[in-house]
């Protein structure tokens, strides 16, 4: 058990480092999205980090199952480190995968990607359907749908998020929309439209993006 506990502790340390790195690249992506300058590379890097976290978490789960009650403290640590990561992963995917019906396929392909290919951002970008044919394509700018940004708006249902992101299709279009533009969408209305406009402006201000990006 001591050797197993030692391996589990090392894996949790790795998870901690991965989580910190994910926070950094996710924050960078958020800033770039609000400045309308996110690239395929930025998105692929975030997905790469998320997949690495999923893999190390899966490994730790196996250790914890073997450790039983002796792994309880580690289990709490892991829970704390990965809190919200699954929903964040789903939101990033829905922002950049063209067809939401492809999410399950993308998940499966990322999971089956060999450990030697998880470092290949081109492979990850192509799994996401972002059409990378050469390394230079990784630096192509790409627009999110705004799903993740909308998820931060209080009192907004998932149905409303889907309806709004389907209506405007990109975050820049959504940020340029007025309350009148948004309130006509099904399941939104005036109050929620106002919340969306105010919250998106606040998000942009929080990352220093201003209302019109750069």
Predicted regions and their residues:
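General structural signal for secondary-structure boundaries
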Residues: 2-3, 39, 120, 178
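Charged heptad-repeat coiled-coil "stalk" segments of single-pass membrane proteins
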Residues: 41-47
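Short, exposed interaction patches on small structured surface elements
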Residues: 1-19
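Long, highly charged, low-complexity intrinsically disordered interaction regions
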Residues: 16-17, 21-30, 47-50, 58-185, ...
